[in-house]
């Protein structure tokens, strides 16, 4: 472990951690929110004196080529945005959480620095937790397309953490799309016809989707 057993005493302040005489509390984001926010969101010029704020130069420039290594490194910045978002949600500061996610997309746009399917799913859920249903729907629409493509490619993928069945069920439940939920459970029933959990959920969604042909 490169943190030599001190991980519970390392507080995140940007792209660096500060060793502090305070142990992190379980399930809390151990960050310095004011410093982290300043580093991630403040626009700074050039100065001989210290000013907080990352420049993010060129990261939203469509004329610049980013290879896979660049894209992997950018996830360190995204991790900082996401930890600040989780902190705000934990504090009940949902507006700040949404603003932080919006700032991340502005500075590190997915269309240029693409995120993997699992991370997109997590971001959509953060918007939902923060009460931004419209933005949840926008992100989850993209996640849904990717999940359906994965399902088409490998319909037996039910074990991976981000397996398409779990993702689609979560999205459709959040959106109240019972007809689509029923389709997912019907597909699972063809793979696991004797599974009691599958059978129970299939019957439940049949009851919630009257008038739909379930034959």
Task: Locate predicted features.
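ER/secretory pathway lumenal C-terminal domains and tails of membrane proteins involved
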Residues: 1-214
């Amino acid at each position: 472990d490169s943190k030599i057993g001190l991980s519970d005493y390392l507080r995140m302040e940007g792209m660096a951690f500060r060793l502090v005489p305070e142990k992190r509390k379980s399930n809390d984001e151990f960050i310095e929110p004011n410093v982290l926010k300043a580093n991630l969101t403040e626009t700074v010029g050039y100065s001989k004196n210290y000013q907080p704020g990352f420049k993010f130069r060129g990261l939203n420039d469509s004329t610049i080529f980013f290879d896979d290594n660049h894209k992997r490194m950018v996830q360190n910045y995204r991790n900082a945005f996401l930890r600040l978002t989780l902190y705000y949600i934990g504090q009940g500061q949902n507006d700040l959480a949404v603003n932080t996610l919006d700032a991340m997309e502005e500075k590190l746009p997915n269309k240029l620095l693409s995120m993997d399917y699992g991370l997109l799913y997590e971001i959509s859920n953060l918007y939902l937790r923060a009460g931004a249903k419209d933005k949840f729907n926008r992100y989850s629409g993209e996640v849904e397309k990717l999940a359906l493509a994965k399902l088409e490619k490998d319909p037996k993928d039910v074990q991976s953490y981000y397996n398409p069945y779990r993702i689609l069920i979560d999205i459709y439940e959040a959106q109240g799309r019972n007809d689509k939920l029923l389709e997912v459970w019907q597909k699972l029933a063809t793979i696991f016809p004797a599974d009691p959990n599958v059978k129970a959920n299939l019957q439940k969604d049949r009851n919630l989707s009257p008038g739909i042909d379930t034959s």
